[in-house]
């Protein structure tokens, strides 16, 4: 009986993943939603708001943060809607999260972190998180073909919400990419690959977190990858870059959408990057 339930649940998870994909959810979101739903099934719960609350209470007791519980709620609400149980989905309310941004690093702190990188790969990872404002998942998914060496920009594919965007990069940052690629001895299509594995798989988010933590610790700082992205936005704003341009650079607008906040062209984005000179400052150029 249990084996039959596992087969049924496996089929449901597969169908739910397809549904999420058609809804335009990113691969990372699909992975997280199906993971939480599988845990929901494993505990033997039924698709009702009452059972969902029991599940959430158990997760909270086990140490889940309010922010993590919000993600679980979104996953369950999506599943209930997938099953046509909209009334049950409506009963689930997201707890309010205090709005807070991670503490921004100073330019001097970023410079110190970059300066202690052990190798060109790690240095470039830090520079892209900061100098291009990338999310960890976006960094890991970057392929070499996403770097336009002639026109000096990155194509970030499948960002949050499955959105793509173009990020102009400075000549200095492009040079760092070229310098790093000359050291690569593998045929992986990805810009960054794992070092310790026999197969050169693409870089994992866990590795990014670990190396950022490692280099932060070397200079006496507790740093996260998102702090580098947040520092990118903060330092751009401090240097007079329009907040609407920063929002687009961060990926808060779809590549095909040109008028969400205001009309912003690639030319203006490039001027913003060149005006800020973030990488040049960090590298002392």
From Swiss-Prot:
PROSITE patterns: CB, TYR_RECOMBINASE
Family: Belongs to the 'phage' integrase family. XerA subfamily.
Statement: the UniProt record of this protein carries the keyword Cytoplasm: yes
Residue stretches making up the Tyr recombinase domain: 100-274
Domain Core-binding (CB), residue spans: 7-84
Protein function: Site-specific tyrosine recombinase, which acts by catalyzing the cutting and rejoining of the recombining DNA molecules.
Alphabetic keyword roster: Cytoplasm, DNA integration, DNA recombination, DNA-binding
Gene3D superfamilies: 1.10.150.130, Intergrase catalytic core
Molecular function as annotated in GO: DNA binding; tyrosine-based site-specific recombinase activity
Protein name: Tyrosine recombinase XerA
Gene Ontology biological process: DNA transposition
Annotated InterPro entries: CB, DNA_brk_join_enz, Integrase-like_cat_sf, Integrase_catalytic, Integrase_recombinase_N, Integrase_SAM-like_N, Tyrosine_recombinase_XerCD, XerA
Organism: Pyrococcus horikoshii (strain ATCC 700860 / DSM 12428 / JCM 9974 / NBRC 100139 / OT-3)
GO cellular component: cytoplasm
Active site residues of this protein: 135, 160, 226, 229, 252, 261 (o-(3'-phospho-dna)-tyrosine intermediate)
Lineage, uppermost ranks: Archaea, Methanobacteriati, Methanobacteriota, Thermococci, Thermococcales
Intracellular or extracellular location(s): Cytoplasm
């Amino acid at each position: 009986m249990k084996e039959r339930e596992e087969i049924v649940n496996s089929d449901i998870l597969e169908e739910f993943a397809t549904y999420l994909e058609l809804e335009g959810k990113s691969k990372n979101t699909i992975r997280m939603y199906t993971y939480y739903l599988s845990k929901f099934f494993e505990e033997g719960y039924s698709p009702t708001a009452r059972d969902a609350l029991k599940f959430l209470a158990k997760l909270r007791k086990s140490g889940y943060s309010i922010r993590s519980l919000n993600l679980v709620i979104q996953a369950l609400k999506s599943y209930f809607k997938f099953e046509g149980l909209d009334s049950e989905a409506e009963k689930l309310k997201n707890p309010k999260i205090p709005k807070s941004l991670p503490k921004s690093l100073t330019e001097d702190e970023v410079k110190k972190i970059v300066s202690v990188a052990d190798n060109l790969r790690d240095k470039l990872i830090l520079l892209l998180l900061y100098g291009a404002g990338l999310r960890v998942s976006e960094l890991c998914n970057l392929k070499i073909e996403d770097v336009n060496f002639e026109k000096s920009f990155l194509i970030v594919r499948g960002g949050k919400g499955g959105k793509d965007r173009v990020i102009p990069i400075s000549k200095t940052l492009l040079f760092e990419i070229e310098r790093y690629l000359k050291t690569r001895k593998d045929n992986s299509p990805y810009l960054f690959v794992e070092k310790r594995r026999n197969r050169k798989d693409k870089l994992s988010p866990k590795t990014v977190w670990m190396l950022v933590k490692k280099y932060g610790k070397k200079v006496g700082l507790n740093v996260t990858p998102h702090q580098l992205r947040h520092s990118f936005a903060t330092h751009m704003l401090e240097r007079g870059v329009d907040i609407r341009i920063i929002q687009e650079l961060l990926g808060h607008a779809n590549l095909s959408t040109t008028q969400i906040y205001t009309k912003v062209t690639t030319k203006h984005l490039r001027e913003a990057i060149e005006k800020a000179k973030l990488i040049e400052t960090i590298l002392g150029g």
